[in-house]
Amino acid sequence: SGGSRAYLYAPSSVEIVSGTQTKDVKDTRMAPQGLLGARIYTVTELSSAYPAELTVRASWVAEPQTQEQERYAQAEAVYREFVFRNYTAVDKELAPVLQELFWADAQEDGDSIYSAVNRVRQVLSQRTETASDGTLSADVLDLLTGTGRGNAVLYASAAVQALRSRGIPARYVEGYYVSADMARSSASQAVTLTAQNAHAWAEVYFDGIGWLPVDVTPGYYFDAVTLQQMVALPDATHKTAAIDDAERDSSQAEGGGTTGKSPLQETV
């Protein structure tokens, strides 16, 4: 059946939503206003050539040059305090396991988000396998210390806990995965999303920037060598637009950016 009109399905890099009135549901997601929700709307988004973990904040964030920049910096600083109070808690049962598996041999002065994410991916890829037959680990603890059979939900959940245990604010996100190939092959036609396209990932808070998506599910991210090569390349940001029709459970996209994926998100 079609997607729920109570939710606004948009890429994580959304810039503008037009065609419907929206509201913020606390700091977790946007939602359409009105009892009937949204049927058709247009989303404009900014796709970067870099994956999120390579994002670097603008220099003016530390030293604002205009009143607008100053207002942004002040508001972000207030919200950042809220983020660190509410998105760094770790499950007590998992805490010692996370420390042993992910950070026992890490540097004491703390890792950058980039290196921490790479560490999480490395540990998960070495200790677990994707459960293609549907036989999953019971929970994150079982994934890390027991059967080691995961899917996107378990990988994202483990990553959130692991990053939080390193002092990095993170949260769990569910949505749909639209690959660049899907977007290109559809051209101006509809892309139909079903349960087969359901996905989960983590969002990590970058100081001065905000929440950005980070995927740790094997097969859904660039390897460490490719990431290092990307650092030397100039970034290019592309603006694309997509139309969502929740009643038909479809999405139309013009271009797919250059990131290789365009997740449509609901944050929980």
Regions found by a protein language model. Name each.
Residues S1-K23:
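Beta-strand-rich, non-transmembrane domain signature
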Residues S12, E45-S47, W60, E174-Y176, ...:
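A mature extracytoplasmic/lumenal domain signature
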Residues E15-T147, R166:
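Acidic low-complexity segments
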Residues V43, A58, T259-V268:
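Hydrophobic, helix-length membrane anchors
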Residues D142-G150, A190-L193:
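Short, contiguous acidic/charged loop-to-helix segments that flank catalytic cores in large enzymes
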Residues V153-T240:
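Hydrophobic/aromatic-rich core segments of domains that either
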Residues M230-A232, T237-P263:
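Ser/Thr/Gly/Pro-rich low-complexity, disordered linker/stalk segments of secreted
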